[in-house]
């Protein structure tokens, strides 16, 4: 019998011991009976995202977990962000991640314009322009975030960013990284100058300044990319795929792979999200889909904040939400892992491996009874993210035999 698959990715799960938790990791310090139950009934190990020592992004790691080599298919983050916001991207279009930022006297004083969102749709509409042969479409996202899609002849993604990536610096002039990007850099610089003029004079920003708030008078762009020619998830893995995720960029990746994207009320993509709702939705989807991806972002948020106790508490909240997984092993394969480590001491992605567990009825436990960085390392698996899909398909009775 072929089984459905649920892959649960706890973003930035892995960590390092911290004095705030008596020299334990947040995972070790957390009360986690359901994760430990999965470990006690499953196959355990450690997983290197991409390969040992690589500090990967969530985007490249998720691509590899889904069976795609990011060295071949990764288009940059821009297309994911735009697709995640529901924008159309045609072949040849160029997509960017974008922020509304605050420019004061030619210097970026806040890359996020106070994380203000009210009025950003108006700002985005105001700088969605046609300039000669080129059209520029901007869509507002969560808080200060946005995406930009450029259409026109001979666009190249061989260009840099306008985002200086920290405050106290002027916005960068976009420069080509290859001669093929010369014309695109010129077009982008002309557009960003016009956008700056429009934003500085816009009613929304004048109102913000009047009320002592930061104006979003600069559009910072980065991560230019084009949509690649890429096989759908169904074409590649012979499964009908779904995702239950909150982050717009990850929705964009799933849409690029032609997976079905589902929203859950209260699933915010941050701390306090509706974790139980996500798990219950994934369980429900096993009746209509062969594969379900769940991403929970809150662990990564706590790691980037350097907050050991918060990351421990988030893991405990997530663990409570996982109770329904223990009763579906007869018809589903469950995998729980991270996409990378985000140690609280480092406040960024590291190259450390992450724990991983595979569970379904009938698998032989490898003697591991706790789910954490150290205990899982005594399990039977030492794998990379490229191995995960093969293991899942084999356990689900969906793999082909290699040879005769």
From Swiss-Prot:
This is 2,3-bisphosphoglycerate-independent phosphoglycerate mutase. Its EC number is 5.4.2.12. It catalyses: (2R)-2-phosphoglycerate = (2R)-3-phosphoglycerate. Catalyzes the interconversion of 2-phosphoglycerate and 3-phosphoglycerate. InterPro entries: Alkaline_phosphatase_core_sf, ApgAM_prokaryotes, Metalloenzyme, Pglycerate_mutase_ApgM, Pglycerate_mutase_ApgM_sf. Keywords: Glycolysis, Isomerase. It comes from Thermoplasma acidophilum (strain ATCC 25905 / DSM 1728 / JCM 9062 / NBRC 15155 / AMRC-C165). GO terms for molecular function: metal ion binding; phosphoglycerate mutase activity. Residues 162-183 have a biased composition (Basic and acidic residues). One of its GO terms (biological process) is glycolytic process. The keyword Isomerase applies. The keyword Transferase does not apply. HAMAP family: ApgM_A (MF_01402_A). Gene3D superfamilies: Alkaline Phosphatase, subunit A, Metalloenzyme domain. It holds the Pfam family Metalloenzyme. Pathway: Carbohydrate degradation; glycolysis; pyruvate from D-glyceraldehyde 3-phosphate: step 3/5. Residues 155-183 are annotated as: Disordered. CDD domains: iPGM_like (cd16011).
């Amino acid at each position: 019998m072929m089984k459905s698959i649920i892959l649960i990715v706890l973003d930035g799960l892995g960590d390092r011991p911290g004095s705030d938790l008596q020299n334990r990791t947040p995972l070790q310090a957390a009360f986690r009976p359901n994760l430990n139950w999965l470990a006690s009934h499953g196959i355990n190990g450690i997983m290197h995202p991409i390969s040992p020592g690589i500090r990967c992004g969530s985007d490249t790691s998720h691509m590899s977990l889904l069976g795609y080599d990011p060295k071949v298919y990764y288009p940059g983050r821009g297309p994911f962000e735009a697709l995640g916001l529901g924008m159309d991207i045609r072949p040849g279009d160029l997509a960017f991640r974008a922020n509304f930022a605050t420019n004061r006297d030619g210097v970026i004083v806040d890359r996020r314009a106070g994380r203000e969102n009210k009025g950003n749709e108006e700002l985005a509409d105001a700088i969605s322009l046609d300039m000669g042969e080129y059209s520029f479409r901007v869509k507002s996202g969560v808080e200060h975030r946005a995406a930009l899609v450029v259409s026109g002849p001979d666009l190249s993604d061989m260009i840099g960013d306008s985002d200086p990536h920290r405050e106290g610096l002027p916005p960068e002039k976009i420069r080509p990284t290859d001669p093929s990007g010369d014309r695109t850099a010129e077009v982008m610089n002309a557009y960003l100058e016009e956008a700056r003029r429009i934003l500085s004079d816009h009613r929304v920003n004048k109102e913000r300044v009047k009320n002592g708030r930061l104006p979003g008078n600069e559009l910072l762009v980065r991560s230019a990319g084009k949509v690649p020619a890429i096989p759908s998830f169904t074409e590649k893995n012979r499964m009908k795929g779904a995702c239950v995720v909150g982050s717009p960029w990850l929705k964009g990746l799933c849409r690029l792979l032609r997976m079905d994207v589902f929203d859950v009320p209260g699933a915010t993509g941050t701390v306090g999200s509706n974790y139980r709702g996500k798990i219950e939705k994934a369980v429900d989807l096993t009746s209509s889909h062969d594969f379900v991806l769940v991403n929970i972002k809150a662990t990564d948020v706590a790691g980037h904040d350097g907050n050991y106790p918060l990351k421990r508490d988030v893991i405990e909240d997530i663990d409570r939400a996982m109770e329904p997984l223990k009763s579906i092993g007869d018809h589903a394969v469950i995998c729980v892992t991270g996409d990378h480590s985000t140690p609280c001491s480092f406040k960024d992605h590291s190259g450390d491996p992450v724990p991983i567990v595979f569970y379904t009825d009938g698998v032989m436990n490898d003697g591991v009874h706790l789910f954490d960085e150290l205990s899982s390392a005594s399990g039977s698996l030492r794998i990379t993210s490229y191995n995960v899909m093969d293991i899942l398909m084999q356990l689900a009775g969906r793999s082909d035999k290699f040879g005769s």
